[in-house]
């Protein structure tokens, strides 16, 4: 089984200690991104996985490529010489809490278009994993996402769609319409309970999962935070799946 994960990654600066960002003397440099996080997790489980996106031809872009490859992820990227890799700053105002600021306007990832995709690799993959973040970044990234889904649908590649709503990027109404369009062409849909309500208008997990299935996918997973998830797959209600406990890292 091979997987392609499509979506933007960002350079990440994390405050080295708890406190207001302007009072923290040092920050740790890394990177983050919903789709590349999935890619890393799969690679650690031994699954062949490719991360596909567009990066700035800069130090952050090179850092992201290098660290992904160090994790065993194949990076199918194109480099933009005129746009930067996006950046996010993460502060820890109190123990157990965090706040994130994004600097992604005009980023290389926001300039992604269908021409930057390795369509052949998508067609050859078993699974294409996407999120709603890509659709929110602009017309070019949305067109790229649509082209990737078209290629997957045409070749029998399973489409995994995690809603991953970002309210800072677009309005609820615009997002909900786009999510329904994408979900209708996906095979598996993941959504938090608040995202599932945005997508379907339903409030209970079982009703949310059923309404997602009605859009077209065969599997729906409604994420319930510490309580786990509610899953509906191929007509069978798997019901509540317990969550696993963890700790901040």
Segments the model singles out, each with a brief description of its role:
Residues 48-132, 157:
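Conserved N-terminal subdomain of the carbohydrate kinase-like
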């Amino acid at each position: 089984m091979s997987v392609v994960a499509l979506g933007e990654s960002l350079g990440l600066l994390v405050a080295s200690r708890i406190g207001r960002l302007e009072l923290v003397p040092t920050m740790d440099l890394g990177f983050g991104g919903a789709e590349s996080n999935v890619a890393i997790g799969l690679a650690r489980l031994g699954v062949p996985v490719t991360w596909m996106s567009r990066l700035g031809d800069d130090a952050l872009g090179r850092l992201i490529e290098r660290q992904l490859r160090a994790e065993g992820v194949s990076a199918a990227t194109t480099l933009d010489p005129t746009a930067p890799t996006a950046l996010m700053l993460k502060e820890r105002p109190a123990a157990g809490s965090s706040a994130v600021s994004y600097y992604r306007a005009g980023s290389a990832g926001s300039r992604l278009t269908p021409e930057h995709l390795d369509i052949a690799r998508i067609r050859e993959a078993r699974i294409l994993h996407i999120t709603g973040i890509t659709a929110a970044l602009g017309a070019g990234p949305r067109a790229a996402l649509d082209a990737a889904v078209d290629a997957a649908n045409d070749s029998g590649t399973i489409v995994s769609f995690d809603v991953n709503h970002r309210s800072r990027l677009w309005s609820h109404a615009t997002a909900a319409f786009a999510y329904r369009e994408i979900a209708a062409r996906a095979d598996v849909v993941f959504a938090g309970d608040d995202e599932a309500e945005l997508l379907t208008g339903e409030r209970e997990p079982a009703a949310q999962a059923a309404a997602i299935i009605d859009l077209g996918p065969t599997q729906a997973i409604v994420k319930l935070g510490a309580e786990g998830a509610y899953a509906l797959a191929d007509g069978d209600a798997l019901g509540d799946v317990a969550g696993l406990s963890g700790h901040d890292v």
